């Protein structure tokens, strides 16, 4: 049998602070709400005493301590040295912070073998990378709210509307559907603004012959959604010929990559990205693009096909892109094209920036598109933008 306990160190309730900031969990809440076996004050000396007592009895230690902001990321110390510094700060005897010298010796023994100390964050990321059915239900609700909000934006777009007004529509529609907040600073990029992948000024007026790429998503019950759609801003709500051709090329790549996002096919995020590059290369050549080596990934499609999604927008960062997709993982699939005003590219497509993105929950033999409520077929987008549905 394996026995374990959960001891939470939390800030005690402070009536004066709660007067300003509202109620807090406190020690009672740690047990009653979060199910901790034991709750104690987060006073540093109390925590130090408890942690030192636990460390002397364990064979493996999983830990991540707050990093000093002045230490560059590449020079941060590994968990072994960080916990050593925390448990045994410089002192005249080397072990006077411990009750017994044997405790100090046990800590030295534990920390002397790098195989015994591990990053807790990496272990948590592995667990977080596969969502439960309930987590996926919450993410589906976030995707549905964002999808409905995206539809409302399509209904609102017209020449002369400010990007910021479209943003306000999106945020209002998310809020009235129960979203706590936006999951990130949204992109409402019309015309040539869409050539900037992370354009967030959102202060231009929509033109009559442009498209607008909207990259936005709400957070619901702590989980993020992340959706991108591209829509015409013309008075009739219809794409021009070149706009439609480029968008449909992207849409085929999105669908092709989404179809590969199942556990049984053995793909990883890296594998999906390679396939997206192959698909986009083929689509662009069919549209008359002359692609030299590296042009696609260096200029036209400089970002990755997607990222993990969950509690964080870019979730579980320590889970490698080379990790095979497993049931319960959630990822974004977001091919994009950004054609600069350069004679190297067909004139009809110059100045067009587009992206289309879905949130996908992986299953063994298929997947679930969590953002399916946001229109993405050309006919549907034009019908909504044109006020026909």
Residue ranges of model-derived segments:
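Active-site neighborhoods and metal-handling regions in enzymes and metal-associated proteins
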Residues: 1-389
